[in-house]
Amino acid sequence: MNIQKDDWMDRRKIVRRNTQSSASTYVLEKLHIDLVIEILSRLSAKSIAICRCVSKQWNSLLVSQDFVESFLRSSLSRPRIWFTFRFDGKWNFFSSPQPQKFGNNLSVEATEHHMGSYENWYMKSCQSVHGFIFMSYNSKGMTDRTQVIWNPCTRQLITLPKLEPENLDFNSFFAYDPTEKQFKVLCMTVVNKQQTTSYKYQVLTLGTGPLLWRNIECPFMYRLRDKSNRGICINGVLYFIGWIKCSTMIIICFDVSSEKFSFIKIENAFIVTLINYRGKLGVYLVVYGSPRGEVWVLDDTKNDNWSKHNFVCPYSGQENSTWATGTGELVWPSSPWTQPFYVVYYNLERQSFRRVDIKGMENKVSTGKDRYDGFFTFTNHVENLMVLPLHKKTIPIQDTLTNRVMERETLTRSPLTQTAYASSYSTTRSYKSSGKRCSDRSIGEDEQDDIGEKRGDQAAERRERSTKRGKHEVH
């Protein structure tokens, strides 16, 4: 009797599963594919991961390039504010919605993002560009710096190759080229510590082939404002602050597509922060000790036309963490040890401000300065389902001990599909070769391909040995 009941339950599960699959197939057949994409693109990345499990047809649709691009366009209309901070020796990552409606006493729920083991990181820089997070850090007990790119939606983690020469001080900036749809990393290494204006410029492009650093030139000399100098990428141009002859402050402009440098002279001020103001470059200026501030907006990049906005700062806190939203609001987060943690939005046009409490971070936000270490904030963060396609490359490396060239295979993460994401969280593994740590890679179909290639090579070697042995016997 129990056997019959178990069989009946199994048949019921099979029928239910087949019914669900048939229903999902019916929906795809009856509704136009563009309409289905439009509807599903309004869901969150977590909901998309669940929808991928409905059927093979749904999975195929949701990993297509058309859907990934449609989802990104929809995500741009619902930006989020990103928080990265260190609490009790561990790095925490949160994001919360940017409220689009005006009003006071608002509150939003924060979502925690998990990346892996990062307790021993000493973060040097952190940037958010087009849904990807770029981080540069030193591990505990190590002098050389590691650079990684992380997509919180897909959990794809890319470790960038080491710079040559190693163990030198450098600054890196993350940027996106909307024309070619490429991510790039610009790195400036201090060649001569006695001359801080002497830089070696290198660029790395992601998604087009092996991860390799290329040397480029800058036609003018300058000095970066400080090591914590943050850059901002707007419409394919990377901006960051520097000095000429230690007296003139400038904004360095790096065209991500052409990889050409230029600069704009600006007024010296105690606090200068670059912001994205309604898709245009904005310069936030505050004089030390004064509540009044200015925002200069570059309205015309070709003719160098600026517009000026005066305001009274409603919040004197993290001035260096000042950002702007797509609706033209300035953003200041409260001090990390403030309870409750909140964000202040100031509208320049209305000259009004509002406070939004951030919930869900109470147990992770520090309640004392002694437990707080490092804090990064970004506005206009979006969910991006893109997976960067990477490759593996054999790079010759000179072995100074034996004076011979060694072949080091640099392994990089290879996604299961070009647009696999969300629930396709891949397990990473570290590889060592030639005494150096190589980049992470996925354990999946790429490893199966490597096994297949090795078996094919072994079979070819056996055939070659058999042929040679046959010729020897004939002679």
Curated annotation (Swiss-Prot):
Residues 451-464 have a biased composition (Basic and acidic residues). Pfam families: F-box (PF00646), FBA_3 (PF08268). Coiled coil: none annotated. SMART domains: FBOX. Residues 465-475 have a biased composition (Basic residues). Signal peptide: none annotated. Residues 423-475 are annotated as: Disordered. InterPro entries: F-box-assoc_dom_typ3, F-box-assoc_interact_dom, F-box-like_dom_sf, F-box_dom. Residues 423-433 have a biased composition (Low complexity). It comes from the Eukaryota. Residues 25-71 form the F-box domain. This is Putative F-box protein At1g46840. It comes from Arabidopsis thaliana (Mouse-ear cress).
